[in-house]
Amino acid sequence: MQTPAPVEYSRATSVDDVIEKLVSLDGKARILAGGHSLIPMMKLRLANPGHLIDINPLESELSYVREEGDEIRIGAMTRHKDLLDSELLQRVFPNIFEEAEWVLADPVVRNRGTIGGSLCQADPAEDLSGVITALHGKAVVKGPDGERVVDMHEFHLGPYMTVVQGTEMVTEVRFEKGPGQHGSAHEKVERRAGDFAIVAASAALWLEGGSIARVGLACSAVGPTTIQMTRAEEMMVGKEPSDELFAEAGKISTEDCEPGSDGRGPADYKRAVAGVLSKRALIRAWTRARGETLPRHSHWHPQA
């Protein structure tokens, strides 16, 4: 079956209008942004909303990348191509968004897909969730009772499940800029260019006085959600960076991930790759934090 079930459609005029519509429809509506995940699921009858609320008219309200005090804020309707082209993101968080966006699907998806849509789709193998988790990002969720701010490591409940209720929507993603010298990187193993990850790792660190003042490490496609490697992060904070330290962090990643065997590979393989990519991403982030320039990573395809 490649035809969606009958569905009602309306265009939103504001965020408040979206919330009102969601409430009036008793949470049975779905929000339509880029549509590259939702529409295929509707065609396969894996998603059968009774009503679609199109938020594309809200780009002027929800599409932005801006700096506010010690935070970077990204509107939920900001498209992947705009994240890739953002000079502000390249200045504050150089490389990590670029490396993730270049391997996210293809230009058609990047031109239409949005950061909010990617997060709410909650695919465990999705690239941006790892980036946002490594940067210790937070999602702003708005509903009839007001706004709440959710840490990214608490945002996803399982595959295709989030904390966002049927009468709520994501409006923004926020990041603290962090102290000292910063470096970050995104590593990915995929079957072919633009595919979902077999395994991916995102790392970000901040150096002060030669030691790690803050660090984020996340792995995707090795569990029911993107996994923040909290134990590895805590082990690294306050220590001087080194290849040996990052090798230990990679070992912890292999222990703390929860991969399953599927068409992309056996669990033991994914576990080993998570450790290798974690170490590699941390070393590249450290190199960049020292001010050295590295080219955008050429991601590895097993069949090559």
Language model region names:
Residues 1-304:
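C-terminal structural segment of proteins
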